[in-house]
C-alpha cells in the first residue's frame, strides 16, 4: 500500500487533536476513527476502538506510535483451520 507523502504529515481526526492538549479527556475514550494515526502524546492512555460491532480496549504504548488505531482492533473473527475432522466423519463426497 502506498505511504502518505511526508510533506502532508500523518492524518489525525480533528477531535483527537483537541484531545491531545487535554490528556485526562483521552483516558478510556471511545474512538470511531480507525484511520487516524497514533501520536506520541497518546502514550500510556487506554482507548476503546470501534471494530464495527463493539469497542475493543487498547493501551497505547511507544511501539504503537505512528500506526493507525484500526490496526489494533480486528474486524474479523479468527477461525481455526479444519484440518482435523473427528472420528466417524468422512471427508469429501463419494
From Swiss-Prot:
The keyword Manganese does not apply. GO terms for biological process: ribosomal small subunit assembly; translation. One of its GO terms (molecular function) is structural constituent of ribosome. It is found in: Mitochondrion. Its main location: mitochondrion. Keywords: Mitochondrion, Ribonucleoprotein, Ribosomal protein. PROSITE patterns: RIBOSOMAL_S19 (PS00323). Gene3D superfamilies: 30s Ribosomal Protein S19, Chain A. Pfam families: Ribosomal_S19 (PF00203). GO terms for cellular component: mitochondrial small ribosomal subunit. Belongs to the universal ribosomal protein uS19 family. This is Small ribosomal subunit protein uS19m. It comes from Petunia hybrida (Petunia).
